[in-house]
Amino acid sequence: MPSENKTSLSPWLPAFLSLIIPGSGQIILSHKTRGFALFLAFFALLGLVLWTQAYALLAPLALLLIWIARDAYRLAKGSEPSWGVSLLLIGIVLYGTALIVTEVRPTRMITGLPNVTPYLRSLFNPELFETPMKEVVGVTPIMVPCVDPLPAPNREATTSPQLILSAPCTEVGDLLQVTGAGFEPNESGQMQWIDPLGSPRRATFDGEVVTFKADENGRFDVTLLVPQAVPLTAQPAPGETLTHAVRAVQNIPSGRLQPTQTLSLVIEKIGETIALAFLATVMGVIFAVPVSFLAARNLMSGNPVTMLIYNVVRAILNVIRSIETLLWAIIFAVWVGLGPFAGTLALWFHTVAALAKLYSEAIESIDSGPIEAVKATGASWPQMVIYAVFPQILPTFTSFTLYRFDINVRLSTVIGLVSDAGLGFLVVQWVRLNRFSAMATALIAIILVVAILDFLSSWLRERIIQGRPIISSTNPLVRTVLKTVIIVGFVATFIWSWNVAQIKLIELVKGAPQGLALAREFATPELFTRPTKTVAISAPLTVPCGAAEPSTPADATITLSADCGETGDPLVIEGTGLPPNRTVSVRWVLPDGGYLRVRSNCCDTDDDGNLRVETAINPIVVMEEGQTEPARVEITYEEIAGRIQLSETVRTVIRLSIVTLLMALVATTLGALFAIPLSFLAARNIMGDTPAGRTIYYGLRTFFNVARSIEPLILVLIAATWVGAGPFAGVLALALNNIPNLGKLFSDSIEEINSGPVEAVTSTGATRMQSLVYAVVPQLVPPFLAFIIYQWDINIRMSTVIGFVGGGGIGQQFRIWVSLNQYGAAGTAILAIVIMVWTMDYLSAKARERLI
C-alpha cells in the first residue's frame, strides 16, 4: 500500500547507497532505526560467515544486500516497510553459522545411542530396595601340578558345606569332578577357581561358566576344566607345586526387603540438599532485607548522597546476579576449600542479590500515602520504614522468600557438580563410574523432592497472596501450640542445617587474605597486552679450564669473574646496560639449548640497570667427553616489541561468548519447535473432555512437571555421553530442558485465550483446525514470542555454566582457568559474562515490552 512519506529524492540514490553501505539509504530517508538495524545485522552476519569460513552462506547474504537496496528503493517510492524476506535471509545465515559454531551433528545422536541407552534403561531400574543376601560358601584346596611326594596344602577346606574332589592334585587342562554336600537345598550357585594368590575366577567347562543347583539334600555334582591360573613365567620349579582351591558359592535371599545402600546415601544427600537451600535462604533474607531498602528508589531519592548509595547498591546487585551460582561456588571453593560450606556461601551470596532486587521492587511499588503521612509527623527514616513500609511489604516479601527457597533447592541439587555437597555430587560420581542405576535413583529423588517442595511453596505463596491464614484453626490453644511447634521446628532446622553445611566461620576468616587476593586478581581482567621479545646476553664458561675454546666471545655487557674453573668455584656474574629496575633471569645454558636457573626468584636490576650475582659453578656446566663447545652464562629479559593490543585472553573470551550466545539461540529454537505442538496437546480447552483428550492432557502435563525438575547441568552429563563433550552437548541439554519449560508456558497461555473469537469462528461451521488457525493462533503469537525471548535470556545465563560438565562455551574455559590459577583470565570471562547477560537482559526486556 503506498505511503504518504514519499521523498523527492530519486529512489535509485538510496538504493545505490544501501548497496554500497547497507542501511545508509534507509538512514537518509529518515528511517534511522531501520537503517542502523540493517547495517549492524549485515556486518554482524558477514563477520560470522568469515569467522566460520562458511562461504556458501555468502549467497543468502548477497541476497540480503540486494533486499536492503530494494527496501530503500521502495521506501523512497513511498511503500510501507516490511521485514518478511529479510528475516528469512537473516535466519538462514544466522542459523547456518550457529549450527557450525555449536557443532550440531544430528548423526551423532544416532551413532551415540549405544552410549546413552544404559542411562535410559537405568531409569526403569533404580537401586531402591533389596533383599539381604546370605552367602553359602564351600572351599577345598587342590595342588597344581601333581608331584611326588605331594605336600600338604597351605589352606584349609570347609567342612560345612563341604566340597569333595575326584583327585587331590591335577594338571592344567584336566577335567575335575566336584561333589558338594551341605549346601542350601534347591538353590543355585556358581563354581569358582581360586589361584595361589587368592584371586577368584569363574570356573568353566566346554567354554561355559559352571553353575550348579543343589538337590533337596543339599548335594550336587559338576565337572570343571582346570584353568591356566598361574602365568607361564611364574610356574613352580620341577618337583614343586602350588596350592589352588575350588570354591562353590550360593547367594540366597535372607530377610525382609530393605532400602539399598544407594537409596540410603541418596536420602542422606537429600537432607544435605534441603539443608543447604534452607540455610542459604534464611541467611540470604537476613542480609537482603536491609540491602533492599538501600536499593529502593522511593526510599533513597531524598538527596544526592542517598541516590548515589542507591545506584551503587543496584549496580552491585546486578553484577552478583549476572554471575551464576556455580561460578560463585568455584570462587568460594578456592577461598574456603571444597565442601558444603563453599556451596552454601555461593547460594547465600546469589540469594542476597536476587532477594534484595525482588524486595526493592516490591518496596518501590507500595502505596506512598502511608509513607507521606508518617513523614509528615516528623518521623525518622527508620521509623518510616517500620510503620509505613513493613506492613505493606511483609506478604510480598514472604512470597518472594518461598519462591527463592524453591530455586535454591533446585540449585542445591547441582551445586555438587563443583563441590562435594548435595545430590549433584553423587550424580557426577556415579556417572563417571558408569553406575547408571544409582544415578537413576538420584534423579528420581531430585524429581520427587523438587516436586513436593514446589507444591508446598506454591500452596503457601497462594495463601499468603490471598491473605488467608496459614493456621486456619480458631482455637487459641491450638494456634498457640502450632505456632510454638513452627518456631521450635524452624530453630531446630536452622541448627541442623548449620551443622550439615559444616559452617566454619574461622575458615572464612583464615582464608580472607587469600580471598581478597583472589578478588583482586578477578577484578583485574587481562584485557590488553603488548608483544615482547626475549633479549639475551651471554658469556662462555669453560669447565674444567682448558677443556675447549669457545667459538663465540662474551657479549660486552656481561662479565664473569673467571672464564673457566672447577665445579664449586666461586663465580661473580655482572651485567651492565640492562633495563633499570627490571626482573631478569640468570641461567646456565648448555650447548644443546638446555638451561638451569642460577638461582630461583632471581634477579632485579638496580636504578642504573646494573646486576651483580654471586654464586658457585654448577656441575651441570662440566664439559663431557666429545663436547667441543663450553656452556655459557646467560642473562635474559623481556623487551616490549610492539603496540598495545587485545590480549589472547580477550580474543578467546570473545570467541567463546559468541559460541555461548549461539548455543542459547539454537537451544531455544529447537526447544520452541518441539514445545509448540506439544503445548496444544497439553491445553485442556484444546483437548476437550473426552477420555483420549484427558489422557493426553494429563500425560503431557505430568511429563512437563517431571522433566522441568531436572536441571540442565545434569542433562549435560547425559548429553555429553550421548554426542560427546562440546557445544552440541550443551545445546542438546538446554533444548531438552526448554521443551517442558516452554511447553508449560505455552499451554498455560493457550488455556487463557479469549473464547469469544473461538466461539465466533466455530459458529460459522468451521472445523477444529480452522478455529485453531483463525481464532487461537493470532492470540498466541505475542505471548509465545515473549516466552521464547524470556527462555533465550535464561539459556544465555545457563550457557555460561553448562561447560563445567562438558557443555562447551565460556563456562568450560572459565573452569580451566580457575583450575590453573589463572584468575586474571577467569576475571576476564566473568566480565564478559556480566556484559553479555546485561545486554541480552536489556534487549529481551525491550522486546517483551513491545510484544506484550
Predicted regions and their residues:
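Alpha-helical membrane-interface segments at transmembrane helix boundaries
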Residues: 267-275, 279, 313-320, 406, ...
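Short helix-to-coil transition segments within interhelical loops
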Residues: 29, 366-369, 373-393, 419-421, ...
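Generic hydrophobic transmembrane alpha-helix motif, especially the helices
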Residues: 306-348, 687, 693, 700-735
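Membrane-embedded alpha-helices of multi-pass transport/permease systems
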Residues: 287-290, 327, 342-345, 349-371, ...
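Hydrophobic alpha-helical segments
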Residues: 10-63, 404, 412-416, 426-451
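Glycine-rich helix-loop "coupling/hinge" segments at transmembrane-helix boundaries
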Residues: 334, 406-446, 465-466, 721, ...
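N-terminal, non-cleaved signal-anchor transmembrane helix
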Residues: 1-12, 31, 46-282, 286-290, ...
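Transmembrane alpha-helices
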Residues: 380-416, 437-449, 453, 457, ...
